[in-house]
Amino acid sequence: MAPKKKIVKKNKGDINEMTIIVEDSPLNKLNALNGLLEGGNGLSCISSELTDASYGPNLLEGLSKMRQENFLCDLVIGTKTKSFDVHKSVMASCSEYFYNILKKDPSIQRVDLNDISPLGLATVIAYAYTGKLTLSLYTIGSIISAAVYLQIHTLVKMCSDFLIREMSVENCMYVVNIAETYSLKNAKAAAQKFIRDNFLEFAESDQFMKLTFEQINELLIDDDLQLPSEIVAFQIAMKWLEFDQKRVKYAADLLSNIRFGTISAQDLVNYVQSVPRMMQDADCHRLLVDAMNYHLLPYHQNTLQSRRTRIRGGCRVLVTVGGRPGLTEKSLSRDILYRDPENGWSKLTEMPAKSFNQCVAVMDGFLYVAGGEDQNDARNQAKHAVSNFCRYDPRFNTWIHLASMNQKRTHFSLSVFNGLVYAAGGRNAEGSLASLECYVPSTNQWQPKTPLEVARCCHASAVADGRVLVTGGYIANAYSRSVCAYDPASDSWQELPNLSTPRGWHCAVTLSDRVYVMGGSQLGPRGERVDVLTVECYSPATGQWSYAAPLQVGVSTAGVSALHGRAYLVGGWNEGEKKYKKCIQCFSPELNEWTEDDELPEATVGVSCCTLSMPNNVTRESRASSVSSVPVSI
């Protein structure tokens, strides 16, 4: 017998060291030839995402072709007269309505939509498969109805945008009706604005006479309705009422939207009283009588203010009053300027008399101008202080002289609170004043109130937290840091924390319930006057002062007003340059920064500034021919 061969066992380590040869795939060979071996030192591999721009359109085209051939369609959508074969996945991908019902029951084979027109549904299905559609004012009603019902939001937006784009005088009410029916907020807002802006032309169209009472009532109540005058609004309302005798019952309610108080007494007689209905209908006649009484009682107009005395389409603008222009001994100014948002500064009117270092206030839509100086005498300004007090009405471009202040005042402050006007401190030929007096419009009288603890002038005041804050100024021949607050409810004064920097001839303004003190001058180390650039802010909530961004240009005897949440500091005298300034500096409390705005037409000191609601340009132009702009006294 032959001996058995001895089998030699290889250990585990020997097996691991064996080389296993695997034939390269064609791809690996190709990569190797180009040096693209993984982990090697060949060319680097960078992956990129590529997009086929034609893939989406091709996919839609393929799906649309499949639907036309009824290939793989798995859902039938029916209307009262017609059915459509579609793919569930396509309809569910663009319609929340189909997505929800198919998610509940994916096996559903048919959906009947009897409230949707075949035309509307066919257009929606075509849009789902192509992303395209043809719209017209004749078909959009059925299409948007289907799109809203099926919750296809992109299609609803396309329809809304189409309505806005195609807006005209002839179809604007049609757009309003569709927008209201299907809750298209953007389209409705656009249509309403279009009608407001083109109301005169719209009132001549056939669509206007078809308005319901609710629709014309909503238009005539609108503050932003663009009209040349309120007389035109009255005539348009009467035109609608007289078109159908059945509308007579709406006369008083509809005409209550006419701003009769903004029509002059002469025009009320000429154009309103001459209309028979205004004399025969008791409720309509009462509207006329109320307007007449409003004009006959000028001192009571503050308490008679209402929606019917407020101008339409008013625009809040910056207004400057008086001052001394130029670097020479030029006469004082009577001019009142306003800044049109589009056209810049223009002359609004003239004051009854020239004025310098006067104070202004706005209350109930009226501009009040008080005190100041009537002569240019730099050596003795207090000698020429006056007690004049007058009121400007921007609706009619007219002035009335009111009761003079009890004391002549210049370099004082004027504040408005709770329907009353407060004049504090200042100086005149007799010296600095501590007195405080309050103007009551209904009686046209000034009433003395508790005086300041010490006489002060060249200060600034602002209203916050129900109190009048009086800041800084000139006390006992020295610049002051002191601050005190007057409480009209208790007719008492309270000391508040001082300013960090003494100042006089400065400004104060309220922004977002905080008082900002800016500008003015103080004495430098050598006893010379220097500009104060620091700006301080008082918070009634904490009762403390803090710093805000400093001024870029120091100014004294400037004017300041708040507009759209910002402070505008205009004109003034710069001590560093010894120069009158025409700059307008704008402060944003949100950004805590100052920026240069446009300039005044002329460098001016002793100028006052306020914000006033003005009629729009069309109204201003039309009233000039019917209402005198010459100052009058009543």
Curated annotation (Swiss-Prot):
InterPro entries in the record: BACK, BTB-kelch_protein, BTB/POZ_dom, BTB_POZ_KLHL31, Kelch-typ_b-propeller, Kelch_1, SKP1/BTB/POZ_sf
Ranges of residues in domain BACK: 172-273
Tissue expression pattern: Strongly expressed in skeletal muscle and weakly in heart. According to PubMed:15302408, not expressed in other tissues. According to PubMed:18719355, abundantly expressed in both embryonic skeletal and heart tissues.
PTM section of the record: N-terminus is methylated by METTL11A/NTM1.
Key words of the record: Kelch repeat, Methylation, Repeat, Repressor, Transcription, Transcription regulation
Modified residues (N,N,N-trimethylalanine): 2
Kelch repeats mapped onto the chain: 317-365, 366-419, 420-466, 468-513, 515-565, 567-614
Gene Ontology BP, a term: negative regulation of protein phosphorylation
Annotated Gene Ontology cellular component terms: cytoplasm; nucleus
PROSITE patterns: BTB
Gene3D superfamilies: 1.25.40.420, Kelch-type beta propeller (2.120.10.80), Potassium Channel Kv1.1, Chain A (3.30.710.10)
SUPFAM superfamilies: Kelch motif, POZ domain
Record-annotated BTB domain positions: 73-137
Function: Transcriptional repressor in MAPK/JNK signaling pathway to regulate cellular functions. Overexpression inhibits the transcriptional activities of both the TPA-response element (TRE) and serum response element (SRE).
PANTHER family recorded: KELCH-LIKE PROTEIN 31, LD33804P
Name listed for the protein in its UniProt record: Kelch-like protein 31
Native species: Homo sapiens (Human)
Organism taxonomic ancestry: Eukaryota, Metazoa, Chordata, Craniata, Vertebrata
